[in-house]
Swiss-Prot record:
Function: The alpha subunit is responsible for the aldol cleavage of indoleglycerol phosphate to indole and glyceraldehyde 3-phosphate.
Record GO terms (molecular function): tryptophan synthase activity
Domain of life: Bacteria
UniProtKB keywords: Amino-acid biosynthesis, Aromatic amino acid biosynthesis, Lyase, Tryptophan biosynthesis
PANTHER family: TRYPTOPHAN SYNTHASE ALPHA CHAIN, CHLOROPLASTIC (PTHR43406:SF1), TRYPTOPHAN SYNTHASE, ALPHA CHAIN (PTHR43406)
InterPro entries: Aldolase_TIM (IPR013785), RibuloseP-bd_barrel (IPR011060), Trp_synthase_alpha_AS (IPR018204), Trp_synthase_suA (IPR002028)
NCBIfam families noted in UniProt: trpA (TIGR00262)
Record-given protein name: Tryptophan synthase alpha chain
């Protein structure tokens, strides 16, 4: 079993839900990411999603787009993100780390370092899962096999518009968990309709046997608690970025820890 599967199995045995915070690697300061990841774990995070900065992030709203632009301006690319994971792993060998991003940085990395280099280097760095927003499941079987060979799960997005056929395609290649995008649109947009999420999850589970995490639109502990009643995991990204984007270096980790502790407490209530 993968580190992600182990984590979900342990949580399930205790009747708990996974808290999955997201942050853009290298934001808001290029050197802060490993410390921020450790703070997230201290606050109760079960899995960490680390965004790989990209210049054209079509699924991201303005908050995460701006974070990615800042990280890119600071020189953060895929190689630097892998180094951040390596540094995190010096002190933490148990918390799963998922890279979330787009195909272009992965393809450029492989052009530079050779075919299969991304899966190899990500595995060596200590990455547990990869979510590539613009890789369709029907074209991912070889990529999924490459990742599996290095102990890495391939995670996919599902949306309110996903058909049963798309869910079946995802189910064939997905492992770890799937990420249900609870709103139409981009990250950080709109108000979350928890009843609509609750209605959709049984349809997803007819086809998908891995845990289902829900994200997009979760901004506070109360919403996280409501989603946690029906989903296996709660993913929070844009709200964290907003909380830390204008903060001085010395306050970033503490603000994140305080926010996530409140969410963790609500999830466990």
């Amino acid at each position: 079993m993968s580190r992600i599967a182990d984590t979900f199995a342990e949580l399930q045995s205790k009747g708990r839900k996974a808290l999955i915070p997201y942050v853009t690697a290298g934001f808001p300061f290029v050197d802060i990411t490993p410390a921020l990841m450790h703070g997230m774990v201290e606050a109760g995070a079960d899995v960490i999603e680390l965004g790989v900065p990209f210049s054209d992030p079509m699924a991201d709203g303005p908050v995460i787009q701006k974070a990615g632009e800042k990280a890119l301006a600071l020189g953060v690319g895929l190689a630097q993100v892998l180094e951040m994971v390596r540094r995190f792993r010096l002190r933490n060998s148990t918390t799963p780390v998922v890279l979330m991003g787009y195909a272009n940085p992965v393809e450029r990395y492989e052009q530079r370092h050779g075919k299969g280099a991304f899966a190899r280097d990500a595995g060596e760095a200590g990455v547990d899962g990869v979510l590539i927003v613009d890789y369709p499941p029907e074209e991912c079987e070889q990529f999924a096999a490459d990742l599996r060979g290095h102990g890495i799960d391939l995670i996919f997005l599902l949306a309110p518009t996903s058909t049963p056929e798309r869910m079946q395609q995802v189910a064939r290649v997905a492992s770890g968990y799937v990420y249900y995008v609870s709103l139409k649109g981009v990250t950080g947009s709109g108000a979350l309709d928890t009843a609509a999420v609750e209605a959709m999850l049984p349809r997803i589970r007819e086809h998908v046997k891995v845990p289902v995490g829900v994200g997009f639109g979760i901004r506070d502990a109360a919403t996280a608690q409501a989603i946690g009643r029906v989903a296996d995991a709660v993913v929070i990204g844009s709200r964290i970025i907003q909380l830390i984007e204008d903060q001085p270096h010395e306050k970033v980790v503490g603000i994140t820890v305080d926010f996530l502790r409140g969410v963790r407490k609500a999830l466990d209530a």
